[in-house]
Amino acid sequence: MLQLLLAVFIGGGTGSVARWLLSMRFNPLHQAIPLGTLAANLIGAFIIGMGFAWFSRMTNIDPVWKVLITTGFCGGLTTFSTFSAEVVFLLQEGRFGWALLNVFVNLLGSFAMTALAFWLFSASTAH
């Protein structure tokens, strides 16, 4: 149990630092769409799709690695709370179109990235 807790801790911290770096680098590039948050959510969605595909095929992977990558790293990297706050800020500024676009791109993009990764890595591990 301690190993699993440490895996979540290390993965979560690493994912959170990665999200912060993405936000620092990419959020200033666009006034309405926080590109760093979007990148974090899309990358995290892709990684978790890839992980689930691999983990469903390779049953001998240590659960510590599964938890480190999915709950830890992807949990720290992706952020629904920051995304929600950024949408609320756009709404408060009266930027309703940008808020809606932000919701659309984050949600559909994340679903698409997870499905794409799952499909790609399920196909690659099937051979």
Curated annotation (Swiss-Prot):
Binding positions (Na(+)): 75, 78
Gene Ontology cellular-component annotations: plasma membrane
Record's keyword terms, sorted: Cell inner membrane, Cell membrane, Ion channel, Ion transport, Membrane, Metal-binding, Sodium, Transmembrane, Transmembrane helix, Transport
Function: Fluoride-specific ion channel. Important for reducing fluoride concentration in the cell, thus reducing its toxicity.
Subcellular location: Cell inner membrane
Organism in which the protein naturally occurs: Escherichia coli O139:H28 (strain E24377A / ETEC)
Pfam families: CRCB
Topological category with respect to the lipid bilayer: Multi-pass membrane protein
Keyword Transport in record: yes
Signal peptide location: none
Listed name of the protein: Fluoride-specific ion channel FluC
